[in-house]
């Protein structure tokens, strides 16, 4: 949804994905597809190199890769922990670092990191995800402080549960770790803390990203902006 919205606004979009879904999106919007694994440093570098080779510069970076693993700390696989940090924290750092020279040279850049309400608060059984998303908020703030003098803004969007495969895939895991039926997970786990009892739609996140990349948001930087249906209002 984010790639589609930015393309609709006139951006030339580079889509990176580990599977064919990204290729389909890129083809539909007339963008460039780069296959890669964000857990690998060489693939992160190749992505930025491809964007620079095709378009000459980079104006906007959206870090949106992520996945979930539900487990207690006691049972959390160490290799899973390392992979989650690589995809959701190290990759955004590397991509920011690789895009920075082009943004600095043109004195304009927009970095939008898709964090989560779990980058601001915590829940049990999600240590890897929560640690990575908290770290991403910290990276965002540091990038904002360093980028202010050269026209680069950096912000994190922190949504509640978004209607995506990532959320769909964790229902069974949530039911298992909490000892409740799968049918109750959305109502009692995902929606219960929210003031507005629904999931966030992907298009809403895409609209927020587009706003942060617009001239109207030029003064917003270093912020962890909630789109949480009232989760953190308590």
Give the ranges of each region predicted by the language model.
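Active-site helix of classical SDR
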Residues: 96, 132, 140
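Residue(s) in the substrate-gating loop at a strand-loop-helix junction
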Residues: 116
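Substrate-binding pocket helix/loop in short-chain dehydrogenase/reductase
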Residues: 72-73, 80-85, 111, 190
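Canonical Rossmann dinucleotide-binding motif of NAD(H)/NADP(H)-dependent dehydrogenases/reductases
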Residues: 1-14
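Short C-terminal tail/terminal secondary-structure segment
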Residues: 121, 209, 221-234
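Short, small/polar-rich loop/turn modules that mediate ligand/substrate recognition or access, typified
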Residues: 148, 153, 220-222
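Alpha-helical segment proximal to the catalytic Tyr-Lys
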Residues: 101, 145-146, 218
